[in-house]
């Protein structure tokens, strides 16, 4: 009798183990399938983003937010960048998402309302806040460039090299305007969740303009408001691959 009960218990344990292993296998297959779907979705979103941002912009629709060629100021050279987002942590690195899909900048996760400061002294090339601070979702193409939501791009000089630095997905609290000079560490905006965004963060891109003069850079941006500085939105022209300036820098090189 006792032996029969033990056999039954052993059989039940074996059956339960087999069922558990089967459930684990199914869960693993579902996770793998989900990850593939996420990767494909990220790739599609990145491709659509590149297409939308490559489209010719109607300058009359954004002229009020773009620096004028009448700017004749100088930019103080500083010895290095400082961290622009005053809190939070890195959530996605540059060139590609961990789950797949092109990603051309550094994502810094921080609560909506976190201070964003000028990483170096410079001048604001573009600043606009057309949408709500926490209005972002994937596939939301509001703002300029498309999907950027509330955005800023500034020009700065670090150790004699001219850089353009972009900030996307900001809140509506933007404290600067095009043509305004700013000092390193000055608060220029608050972080948000606007445009093509899955959560509160600031997307940062850095462009190395080499020995381009401030006046030439201002004139070039004023003419076409090209946030990508001729590098496009498909991932080419990176500085680390040896491309000549203007080229895309990996923001992690300066901000960590």
Please state what every model-predicted region is.
Residues 1-77:
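Alpha-helical oligomerization segments with coiled-coil/rod-like character
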Residues 74-123, 127:
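Domain-scale macromolecular recognition modules
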Residues 84, 99-100, 116-117, 144-146, ...:
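Extracellular/periplasmic catalytic domains that process cell-envelope and extracellular macromolecules
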Residues 116, 122-124, 179-191:
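A structural signal for short beta-strand/turn segments enriched in small hydrophobics and glycine
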Residues 118-172, 178, 199-208:
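Zn2+-dependent peptidoglycan hydrolase active-site motif and core
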Residues 130-132, 188-196:
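Short, charged beta-turn/beta-strand-edge "cap" motif at the junction between a beta-strand
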Residues 177-180, 205-256:
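Acidic, glycine-rich catalytic/binding loops that coordinate metals and/or anionic ligands
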């Amino acid at each position: 009798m006792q032996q029969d009960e033990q056999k039954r218990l052993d059989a039940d344990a074996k059956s339960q183990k087999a069922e558990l292993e089967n459930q684990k296998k199914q869960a693993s297959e579902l996770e793998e399938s989900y990850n593939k779907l996420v990767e494909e979705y990220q790739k599609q979103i990145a491709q659509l983003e590149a297409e939308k941002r490559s489209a010719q912009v109607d300058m009359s629709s954004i002229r009020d937010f773009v620096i004028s060629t009448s700017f004749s100021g100088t930019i103080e050279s500083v010895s290095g960048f400082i961290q622009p987002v005053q809190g939070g942590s890195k959530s996605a690195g540059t060139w590609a998402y961990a789950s797949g899909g092109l990603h051309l900048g550094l994502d810094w996760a921080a609560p909506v309302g976190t201070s964003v400061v000028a990483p170096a002294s410079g001048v604001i090339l573009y600043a606009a806040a057309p949408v709500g601070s926490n209005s972002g979702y994937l596939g939301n193409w509001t703002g300029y460039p498309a999907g950027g939501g509330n955005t800023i791009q500034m020009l700065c000089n670090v150790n004699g090299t001219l850089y353009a630095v972009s900030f996307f997905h900001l809140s509506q609290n933007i404290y600067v305007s095009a043509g305004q000079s700013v000092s390193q560490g000055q608060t220029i905006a608050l972080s948000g969740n606007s445009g093509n965004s899955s959560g509160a963060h600031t997307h940062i891109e850095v462009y190395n303009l080499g020995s381009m003069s401030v006046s030439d850079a201002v004139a070039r941006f004023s003419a076409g408001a090209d946030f990508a500085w001729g590098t496009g939105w498909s991932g080419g022209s990176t500085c680390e691959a040896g491309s000549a300036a203007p080229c895309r820098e990996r923001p992690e090189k300066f901000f960590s």
